[in-house]
């Protein structure tokens, strides 16, 4: 019955195809669609278009509602938390934009895809690497994502300092969480907490207060921040905490400019990576390890085609979505 109804609706749409409106939506059309859905809810989009008095296809109505008009859409730039989650989930699921969007409330799959193409692929091109190459994946894993974490923590510390009217905050670092190789989770910054589902925020808060721990990351892939579940339930990267002592990261990418930190314990594992488009191969040596505190990992020497990655970071200071060093405090 339902299938027959849809076929009839589709046939009717084809018949009246010459009367259908094309091009940008008008304010009046938006109001018709919003008011109809508010009164009757979402339904079969072909029938909805006719019932609402819209000379649009059902597909056009659906896309207009999902991507522009629904009330739970988030507006504005992708936040650092959202960036981190996109990078994390993409490393696990690839270009499955709809699946990734399910874990970023208020963001559309098209919006996430545009972020990936205009930001991530752009920086891979500037580094003369393919976005799917192991070299660029390591740049994201060891540079981009940790700096996003620093930026998130700095924003949280700045907000806490303002609330307390307080004192200077200590340097941020990654603190090993115990024998399980995971990291404990700090509280999410309040201004951006809305980008996470409620269960994520509850999990993050529980890790701080000694309650229910945050979702764990899989340790099956060296250096990756893979989530421990493929289900549609909550998915969240494991967050680092502040620690006294070694600073987590410096602005330089080689040992000569690294000013602190704890070297990774596993120096026997070497990354023998295929060449980048620039023709250079990365090598791993104990002397070239930056001051990272990832457990049981080795890291490549970030000299991609002779490109100075530190200068690259500095040159991107105007790019708020890439350069996490501009922490809002």
Swiss-Prot record:
Stretches for region Disordered: 155-189, 206-242
Amino acid composition bias (Low complexity), ranges on this chain: 155-166, 217-235
Single GO MF descriptor: DNA-binding transcription factor activity
InterPro entries: EOBI/EOBII-like_plant (IPR044676), Homeodomain-like_sf (IPR009057), Myb_dom (IPR017930), SANT/Myb (IPR001005)
Location (main, coarse): nucleus
DNA-binding region boundaries: 45-69, 97-120
Segment forming the signal sequence: none
GO cellular component: nucleus
Tissue: Highly expressed in leaves. Expressed in roots and shoots. Expressed at low levels in flowers.
Entry-linked SMART domains: SANT (SM00717)
Protein keywords: DNA-binding, Nucleus, Repeat, Stress response, Transcription, Transcription regulation
Induction: Induced by salt, cold and osmotic stresses, and abscisic acid (ABA). Down-regulated by salicylic acid (SA).
Segments forming domain HTH myb-type: 17-69, 70-124
GO biological process: positive regulation of DNA-templated transcription; positive regulation of response to salt stress; positive regulation of response to water deprivation; regulation of DNA-templated transcription; response to cold
Localization per record: Nucleus
Annotated CDD domains: SANT
Note: Plants over-expressing MYB2 show increased tolerance to salt, cold, and drought stresses, and increased sensitivity to abscisic acid (ABA).
PANTHER family: MYB TRANSCRIPTION FACTOR-RELATED, MYB TRANSCRIPTION FACTOR-RELATED-RELATED
Role summary: Transcription factor involved in abiotic stress responses. Plays a regulatory role in tolerance to salt, cold, and drought stresses. Positively regulates the expression of genes involved in proline synthesis and transport, and genes involved in reactive oxygen species (ROS) scavenging such as peroxidase, superoxide dismutase and catalase during salt stress. Transactivates stress-related genes, including LEA3, RAB16A and DREB2A during salt stress.
Protein name: Transcription factor MYB2
């Amino acid at each position: 019955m339902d299938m027959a109804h849809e076929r009839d609706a589709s046939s009717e749409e084809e018949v009246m195809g010459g009367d259908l409106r094309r091009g940008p939506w008008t304010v009046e059309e938006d109001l018709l669609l919003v008011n109809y859905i508010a009164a009757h809810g979402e339904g079969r989009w072909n029938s909805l278009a006719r019932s609402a008095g819209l000379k649009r296809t059902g597909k056009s109505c659906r896309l207009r509602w999902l991507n522009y008009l629904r009330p739970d859409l988030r507006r504005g730039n992708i936040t650092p938390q959202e960036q981190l989650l996109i990078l994390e989930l993409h490393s696990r699921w690839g270009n499955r934009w709809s699946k990734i969007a399910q874990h970023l409330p208020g963001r559309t799959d098209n919006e996430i895809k545009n972020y990936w193409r205009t930001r991530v692929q752009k920086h891979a091109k500037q580094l003369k690497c393919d976005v799917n190459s192991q070299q660029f994946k390591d740049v994201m894993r060891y540079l981009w994502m940790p700096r996003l974490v620093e930026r998130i923590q700095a924003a949280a510390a700045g907000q806490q300092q303002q609330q307390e009217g307080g004192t200077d905050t200590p340097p941020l670092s990654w603190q090993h969480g115990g024998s399980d190789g995971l990291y404990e989770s700090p509280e999410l910054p309040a201004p951006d907490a809305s980008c996470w589902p409620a269960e994520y925020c509850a999990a993050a808060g529980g890790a701080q207060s000694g309650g229910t721990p945050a979702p764990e990351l899989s340790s099956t892939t060296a250096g990756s921040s893979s989530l421990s579940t493929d289900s549609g339930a909550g998915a969240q990267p494991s967050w680092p905490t502040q620690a006294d002592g070694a600073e987590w990261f410096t602005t330089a990418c080689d040992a000569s400019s690294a000013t602190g930190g704890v070297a990774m314990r596993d120096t026997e594992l070497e990354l023998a990576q295929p060449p980048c488009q620039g023709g250079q191969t990365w090598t791993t040596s104990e002397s070239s390890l930056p001051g990272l505190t990832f457990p049981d990992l080795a890291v490549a020497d970030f000299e991609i085609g002779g490109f100075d990655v530190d200068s690259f970071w500095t040159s991107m200071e105007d790019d708020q979505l890439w350069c996490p060093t501009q922490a809002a405090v």
